[in-house]
UniProtKB/Swiss-Prot annotation:
Pfam families: RhaT (PF06379)
Name listed for the protein in its UniProt record: L-rhamnose-proton symporter
Main location: membrane
UniProt GO MF annotations: rhamnose transmembrane transporter activity; symporter activity
Keywords noted in UniProt: Cell inner membrane, Cell membrane, Membrane, Sugar transport, Symport, Transmembrane, Transmembrane helix, Transport
Location in or out of the cell: Cell inner membrane
Cell inner membrane keyword on record: yes
Gene: rhaT
Length: 344
């Protein structure tokens, strides 16, 4: 396995670790509605950071975006919006299925759809079937799915042991939302694929290869911001017990604390895709769709490890922890299989 591929896998791991930890600051926010908290964090992660970093990277910000016609930008934006819909469905999936089953189904579907649909759309799915490297990476995808399934089972055992139940368990509604979440969340993978002309244009301007994907986030995350912020603002305006005015009528120290914590959560959320771009840049071009598989499987891996570090599994007993450990090992094996496939 080459150093470039090893570093690509490593950066995807770092990005996934940030994704697994980003909600921790949000949990410390007090006396704010979820909608206000999510909006403040979202403004930082989907608007301020993509624009600020792109402005630093690009020699002429407006000239860069002005060179693309609508036929290039619109698919990137719409796939970003598609991914934004997946974000919203994610929370609803957890409500109706519970954390373990919801994450397992949603992540499993988005891993398959986001990874395998891209080569199908590009017309090079035969690379997966008819080359040794392609078959190895395909095997890695399915091993990763097995790992996700094992971690999901560990979560179910933990919830059963600790008496944790879904907020409003509804299997039919939850499964529908989980499938929708999995499909729509793959929009980020599709957006990155559609944004290749933007990446190439950034490279032509002399932007470091590690950073060439970052300017496209202005458009991708703009689509996600439209959906997420629109959803939050509509609820803040229409739901009677929600009020942004009330949220900002608290004591000033608490408001400042909530803003800073939400902004920190937004920063950590953005960093997952900052390092995703670094990892993506190191993956061989013919296997770039594997970035999504690495990100999502590492997200499950890191989520389990973070839970252990935070002692969320302390009272779960030995069996759930043993099953979780097995699932994490399987995901690590899957990443190595994919790495070897990309190197062959």
């Amino acid at each position: 396995m080459s150093n470039a591929i090893t570093m690509g896998i490593f950066w995807h791991l770092i990005g996934a670790a940030s994704a697994a930890c980003f909600y921790a600051p949000f949990k410390q926010v007090k006396q704010w509605s979820w909608e206000t908290m999510w909006s403040v964090g979202g403004i930082v992660s989907w608007l301020i950071l993509p624009w600020a970093i792109s402005a630093l990277l690009l020699p002429d910000f407006w000239a860069y975006y002005g060179q693309f016609n609508l036929s290039t930008l619109l698919p990137v934006f719409l796939f970003g919006a598609m991914w934004g819909i997946g974000n919203i469905n994610y929370g609803l999936t957890m409500r109706y299925l519970g954390m373990s089953m919801g994450i397992g189904i949603a992540i499993g579907i988005t891993l398959i759809v986001g990874t395998l649909m891209t080569p199908i759309i590009n017309g090079n799915f035969d690379v997966l079937i008819h080359t040794e490297g392609g078959r190895m990476t395909l095997l890695g995808v399915f091993v990763a799915l097995i790992g996700v399934g094992i971690v999901t089972r560990a979560g179910q055992l933990k919830e059963r042991k600790m008496g944790i139940k879904a907020e409003e368990f509804n299997l039919k509604k939850g499964l529908l939302l989980a499938v929708m979440c999995g499909i729509f969340s793959a929009g980020m993978s599709f957006a990155m694929n559609a944004a290749k002309p933007m990446h190439e244009a950034a490279a032509a301007l002399g932007v470091d290869p590690l950073y060439v994907a970052l300017p496209s986030y202005v458009v991708i995350m703009g689509g996600g911001a439209l959906v997420n912020l629109g959803f939050c603002f509509i609820r803040l305006a229409k739901v009677q017990n929600l009020s942004i005015k009330a949220d900002f009528s608290l004591a000033r120290p608490l408001i400042i604390s909530n803003i800073l914590l939400s902004a920190l959560g937004g920063l950590m959320w953005y960093l997952q895709f900052f390092f995703y771009a670094w990892g993506h840049a190191r993956i061989p071009a013919q296997y770039d769709y594997m970035s999504w598989m690495l990100h999502m499987s590492f997200y499950v891996l890191c989520g389990g490890l973070v839970g252990l570090v935070l002692k969320e599994w302390k009272n779960a007993g030995r069996r759930p922890v043993a099953v979780l450990s097995l699932g994490c090992v399987v995901i690590i094996i899957a990443a190595n299989i994919v790495g070897l496939g990309m190197a062959s």
